């Protein structure tokens, strides 16, 4: 089985609990010997442990076609990806995203953190999910927490594959009752579109 996972953090770059949780889950799934995992991360730094997982960087996935040669791709992205993967992803651009701000590689910039424009990054991440879902082969989609639910939904719409969302916490838990209606609606939409919902407790 092959799983396409969407997550916002991956060690050693940890900003909260999602990184260690995602790492542990992926490690456990891969250790069964029955599943390979492709993990889509907003902005890999190149020093992530990836001996047991295939990491794709959203920041390294083109959404606007650029005519760049192999050596330039190697120079820009060789620290975290094989240049051929850039071209494979570029071949699966599915719409005209030229209205978006992209860099010289045709890629959207991501902070790799939780910036003030987090909702914009979440939306852009879901655009990337459409390219990745058209490029990769997988049997199931796994989205870690609300930040990645829109990406998981988009990948499901593109591929028709089942979506499993992993609820690490809800905004009710994080906000102590002062729920952000935008976050709540993203969480609800994720749950409404999921084929499977996993959570960290039975409460």
Listing of model-derived features with the role each one plays in the protein:
Residues 9-21:
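A short, glycine/small-residue-rich beta-strand->loop->alpha-helix junction that serves as a flexible
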